[in-house]
Amino acid sequence: MKYLLLGFAVLTLSFCLPVDATPFFNSKLGYNLSYKAYSGYEKIDWYFPEQTTRMYYSLWQGVGDDIKDKSVPIIIWLQGGPGAASQFGCFNEVGPLYIHPDGKLQENGYSWSNRGHLVCVDQPVGVGFSYNRGKPVTDTYEASLHFTNFLHNFLSEWNFLENPLYISGESYAGHYIPSFARFLMAN
C-alpha cells in the first residue's frame, strides 16, 4: 500500500504545471507514454475573490488526438465520496495508467482517454490537491460555484470552449453533476 501511495504522489506531483510528462516517465519510471499528460491548478475567483482558492486537475491527451482538434470531446471525471480525489479514479479506473501496489505501471487499454481528452478534477475544493485558504466548502451550492468557475477558466485556458463536453463520475458525483449542469446552463 505504501508503494501505491508513493507512486501516486510521484506521478501526480511530477507534472504540476502544463508540461509534457513523457520525459519524466522515460527517465524516472522507465515507462514510455504514447500520449501527453498535463496537470495544474485553476484559480477560482468569480464568487470568492478574497480567498486563495485553486482546483487541481490532470489532463490526459486523447490517444492519437491533436490537443487543438475541436472535434475531440473533453471528458471530465469526478470521483464520488464526497471527499474522494479524482486522481484516485484516474489511476485506478478510467485513466490511461494503472498503478499497482508494487509501484509498477500498467497501461489501461480501456482508458477513457481512448475516446477523448480526459480531465480528472479534484473537487470540491479541499479534496486531493485542490485547496482553499478561506472558509471550507460546506454544500453543493458552493461546490457548484467553484466548479462552474473552474470549468470556464479551464476550457478558456486550453481553448476547449468549442469541443464537445461530457461530465461524468461515480457515487456521490451523481449528486454533484446535476447541480453543476444547472449552474453551467445558467452561466
Residue ranges and their predicted role:
Residues 17-20, 24-32, 119, 149-154, ...:
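Non-catalytic N-terminal regions of enzymes
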Residues 2-74:
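Catalytic-loop region of hydrolases
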Residues 53-54, 58-145, 152, 183-186:
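N-terminal cap/lid subdomain of alpha/beta-hydrolase-fold enzymes
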